[in-house]
Swiss-Prot record:
CDD domains: cytochrome_b_C, Cytochrome_b_N. Heme b b566 binds at residues 97, 196. It comes from Micoureus demerarae (Long-furred woolly mouse opossum). This is Cytochrome b. Its main location: mitochondrion.
Length: 382
């Protein structure tokens, strides 16, 4: 009898991707976040599907429909809170996944890395349009402020903003199209994930040492399937704890108030996972400059492979670069904190310094450290 797993056209692909896939024997827990992101995406699509069955994308009923889901739908409150906190888990895993890629030099798989950056941008867009849907105060004003940034584009800016709004302000047309985008984008993300994995399996996984692991590979199943399963259980435990015990911990209290175009909230701020970029945006006292800095803060990831100056791939054996990496991490946490603070001193100057340091670390200091470490390791004979 032929082995179905190895000969069936579909099972063969699954087998080569998740069962008989040769994987490096030394990949650590930092490599778990790819599979965790896959689980996050599945959770978000399933909870989102059930929410979409009861949600209405109309300005008059959107807020009430969300309240109805929480009050009257069986376990509607749980589905909604899993979806809201699932987004936070998604971004937590995303940031760690990208950080792992930078630390261990995974960005040298350029195709995989570039698709990953596109995925990050798509997930950010999905989260933004999704945040508008409950039609609370922060939903409405967040949408108004962020879409308004496009008006900084010379010549076509104002026309572009009105085109996206579908009118002269954020209104019914905007909400309806944002719901349409929020529904379709996760499926586009799924397709991109397939491409991401396709490119990854062309090269095989990187590993903590950054050395070629071909001499020592082990099958993905059972070694990494069981390891991923442990990751799933831990993540679902954290997500369930969040959704059950403190579902509103990461949300904004202003979103419990229905959207009111006549009343601006005292502090307009996005969800926690956008605060670092929001802080960079606000640190430049010029609209166009701020928008460009905001874009640069994410798009800088694309040029990271070009900034790799070291002969070693990973930071595992490079203490100076390691220090700079953790300084960058601390800097991003500082930016996240600043993004949630009001625009007043000392927060303004801290945000500006942190923004300058962010770009300096990535563009100047880390490449220089790579060159310096190479020179320090070079044997010097008299």
């Amino acid at each position: 009898m032929t082995n179905l797993r190895k000969n069936h056209p579909i099972m063969k692909i699954v087998n080569q991707s998740f069962i008989d896939l040769p994987a490096p024997s030394n990949i650590s827990a930092w490599w778990n976040f790819g599979s965790l992101l896959g689980i996050c995406l599945i959770i978000q699509i399933l909870t989102g599907l059930f929410l979409a069955m009861h949600y209405t994308s109309d300005t008059l009923t959107a807020f009430s429909s969300v309240a109805h889901i929480c009050r009257d739908v069986n376990y509607g409150w749980l589905i909604r809170k899993l979806h809201a906190n699932g987004a936070s888990m998604f971004f937590m895993c995303l940031f760690i996944h990208v950080g792992r890629g930078i630390y261990y030099g995974s960005y040298l798989f350029k195709e995989t890395w570039n698709i990953g950056v596109i995925l990050l941008l798509t997930v950010m867009a999905t989260a933004f349009v999704g945040y508008v849907l409950p039609w609370g105060q922060m939903s409405f004003w967040g949408a108004t402020v962020i879409t308004n940034l496009l008006s900084a584009i010379p010549y076509i800016g104002s026309t572009l903003v009105e085109w996206i709004w579908g009118g002269f302000s954020v209104d019914k047309a905007t909400l309806t199209r944002f719901f349409a985008f929020h529904f379709i984008l996760p499926f586009i993300i799924m397709a991109l994930v397939m491409v991401h994995l396709l490119f990854l399996h062309e090269t095989g996984s990187n590993n903590p040492t950054g050395l070629n692991p071909d001499s020592d590979k082990i099958p993905f199943h059972p070694y990494y399937t069981i390891k991923d399963l442990l990751g799933f259980m831990l993540m679902i435990l954290i997500l369930m704890s969040l959704a059950m015990f403190s579902p509103d911990l990461l949300g904004d209290p202003d979103n419990f108030t229905p959207a009111n175009p006549l009343n601006t909230p005292p502090h307009i701020k996005p969800e926690w996972y956008f605060l670092f970029a929001y802080a960079i945006l606000r640190s430049i006292p010029n609209k166009l400059g701020g928008v460009l800095a905001l874009l640069a803060s994410i798009l800088i990831l694309i040029i990271i492979p070009l900034l790799h100056m070291s002969k070693q791939r990973s930071l595992m054996f490079r203490p100076i670069s390691q220090t700079l990496f953790w300084l960058l991490t601390a800097n991003l946490l500082t930016l996240t904190w600043i993004g949630g603070q009001p625009v007043e001193q000392p927060f303004i100057i801290i945000g500006q310094l942190a923004s300058i340091l962010y770009f300096t670390l990535i563009i100047v200091l880390m490449p220089l450290a790579g060159i310096m470490e190479d020179n320090l390791l070079e044997p010097k004979f008299p």
